[in-house]
Design a protein with these regions (language model features):
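Conserved MFS/SLC helix-loop-helix module at the cytosolic interface between two early adjacent transmembrane helices
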Residues: 73-111
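Helix-loop-helix hairpin linking two adjacent transmembrane segments in secondary transporters
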Residues: 145, 151-196
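Helix-to-loop junctions at the C-terminal end of transmembrane segments
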Residues: 75-86, 274-286, 372
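Helix-breaking motifs and short loop linkers at transmembrane-helix boundaries and internal kinks
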Residues: 52, 86, 107-113, 141, ...
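A membrane-interface helix-boundary motif in multi-pass transporters
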Residues: 172-184, 372-387
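Extracytoplasmic gate region of multi-pass secondary transporters
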Residues: 41, 220-276
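Extracellular/periplasmic helix-loop-helix junction of adjacent transmembrane segments
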Residues: 37, 41-73
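Cytoplasmic helix-loop-helix junction between adjacent transmembrane helices
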Residues: 117-154
Length: 417
């Protein structure tokens, strides 16, 4: 009897959670994911010195890419499961999945084990991001999708900043393993809160209309579905390419800044702060036009970095603006996808665009390395300028869209005919 009362009480708590609470809880999930995703960069100096592992810079890059391979698979499958079984259950499973494998990373005994555990954790991360976006969208007031997506996706760099700070405190004295366990404990606490409070999507519960993935590619939505994925691929390649290579590129160009951490913190802080200003612009003018302009601004800031700025403050301002523009473009592409599809296709659409986009994240470290080795730093900057301009052109172009299917009729009001 007591367990039944607890279950009933938690269900009532979920029903009472306001829309802002649902969005905030989804954002908290993304912060936990961001920590677990980006902690690898903070761990890397200690991993390279790990006794008996023999990790090289080349194998470090391969292990670093494994999480994005997993995220590709997770986004593609998680979105589809969310459209079939609802948002709540797949999201809770995804968070539990990446929490467990993040804890396992702290127990890894070799480079191969760490790479395998990161890949498996990535599956949960990719699924969680796609489903959290779909759920939060369905608790968002009309016209506010861009702001909601920005709030959620700010969790990635916030989690990354948290992992960098944890690394500064713990790495020299305690090694890299505690960073994994801190991430797992934090994610587990978020999971417990979500189990108690996270509701099912109202829109999904109301409609529950059958959908098929093929509808994403059927006329007239097919071109839009493909172009959203191309835009996500190009911009994720730009963003993760910059995150991977900007410190090395600046050193190659002899920029007057010695702290790699300062580059990373400036880029990610700009991403968090600036993205809210661009989200407000998107509320007024629409996600796709602002995303296109934002990608063009990112390309211009990359070009500015490559020209040889000597003023320290100006350089920091350019890097912060670059972070804001590049990250905002990603947010607004997600907002445009969320707005463009009905509820029973939304999870699959977000999973598709994020899944294909993650292939850009997988390719970014390798592509940047190839271009740098074959040519030089200026050509790497030029490569990322081209990918950002490609994203601007694709997301800003006119594509046919299909009208959303009308929702399934709800229950008749009392006394209705």
């Amino acid at each position: 009897m007591r367990s039944e009362a607890v279950i009933a009480g938690s269900g009532a708590a979920r029903d009472r959670l306001p829309a802002t609470g649902v969005i905030g809880l989804c954002a908290l999930i993304v912060v936990a994911e961001g920590y677990d995703l980006i902690m690898y960069g903070a761990m890397l100096p200690a991993l390279l010195d790990e006794t008996g592992w023999g990790m090289t810079k080349s194998t470090a890059g391969t292990v670093g890419s494994m999480v994005y391979v997993g995220m590709t698979a997770g986004a593609l499958t998680g979105g589809r499961l969310a459209d079939r079984f609802g948002r709540r259950r797949p999201l809770l499973v995804a968070v539990g999945w990446f929490t467990g494998w993040t804890a396992a990373c702290g127990l890894a005994g070799s480079v191969a084990q760490l790479g395998a555990f990161r890949l498996l954790a990535g599956i949960g991360m990719g699924a969680a991001a796609a489903v959290a976006l779909a759920l939060a969208k369905e608790y968002t007031a009309p016209g506010r999708t861009s702001l909601t997506v920005t709030v959620l996706m700010a969790g990635i760099p916030i989690g990354g900043i948290t992992s960098a700070l944890a690394g500064l405190v713990l790495l020299s004295e305690h090694g890299w393993r505690p960073l994994c366990w801190i991430g797992a404990i934090g994610s587990a606490l978020v999971l417990l809160i979500a189990i108690v409070l996270l509701p099912e999507s109202r829109e999904f519960a109301r409609t529950r209309t059958p959908s098929r993935v093929r509808e994403l590619f059927a006329a007239p939505r097919g071109p839009m579905t493909i172009l959203f994925a191309v835009a996500a691929f190009a911009e994720l390649l730009t963003w993760y390419g910059l995150n991977t290579w900007i410190t090395t590129l600046m050193r190659e160009l002899r920029y007057p800044m010695t702290s790699a951490l300062q580059f990373s913190l400036t880029l990610n802080s700009g991403a968090v702060i600036g993205s809210f200003a661009l989200a407000a612009a998107a509320v007024r003018w629409g996600a796709r036009p602002v995303a296109s302009v934002s990608a063009c601004v990112a390309a211009a800031m990359i070009a500015a970095c490559a020209t040889g700025l000597s003023d320290r403050l100006l350089l920091l301002a350019v890097i912060a603006a670059l972070g804001a523009a590049a990250h905002s473009t990603l947010n607004l592409i997600n907002a445009a996808v969320a707005d463009a599809y009905p509820a029973d296709l939304r999870g699959s659409a977000l999973g598709w665009s994020n899944g294909v986009g993650r292939l850009g994240a997988v390719a970014a470290p390798t592509l940047g390395g190839w271009v740098l080795a074959a040519t030089g730093p200026l050509q790497v900057f030029q490569t990322f300028i081209l990918t950002s301009v490609c994203a601007a052109r694709v997301v800003g172009g006119r594509t046919p869209t299909g009208p959303p299917r009308p929702p399934a009729p709800g229950p008749r009001p009392p006394g209705g005919r």
